[in-house]
């Protein structure tokens, strides 16, 4: 309108278009997650890595939370894990059957460390570091014929896949340990088609009659 002479001023002068945040990691597809985690362990630490990665994806942990997990963090025979997240807030999370199985396999073959309660240990019997696991995952993803994957992508995939199947944003907020729902909304960027599908399948007044 301003360009064509209908207005004597530009109403959008000084307005800057908001930047789109592309800094969030991309979620892997369920097929890519299966491809990544389908590797057959050949060494002791392959078993550890499989348990670690299965736990990340199963429970949506931050890498810092996962490396801090102890045997005493689990309850009900590895069915739930207690973690301490940001702000020193504790939360209890379910552990999936694949993660539970992988953890038990790791415990069966690992060498006992000086601190028997530490779950994920290195070759010196010490707690592993986030940097070490990032490097291990990077190499594993390339070995599996994939683009580089980092631990946070598994957490992001956990949230995205759970939201796509359930649509329960509030529960996912609790599981991720987000203090604000807006953080979870940004974190789990679903497209409009996915949101419409969830709405159609879940809302009482949106369900189609047979």
Residue ranges and their predicted role:
Residues 1-210:
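Conserved catalytic core of the tyrosine transesterase superfamily
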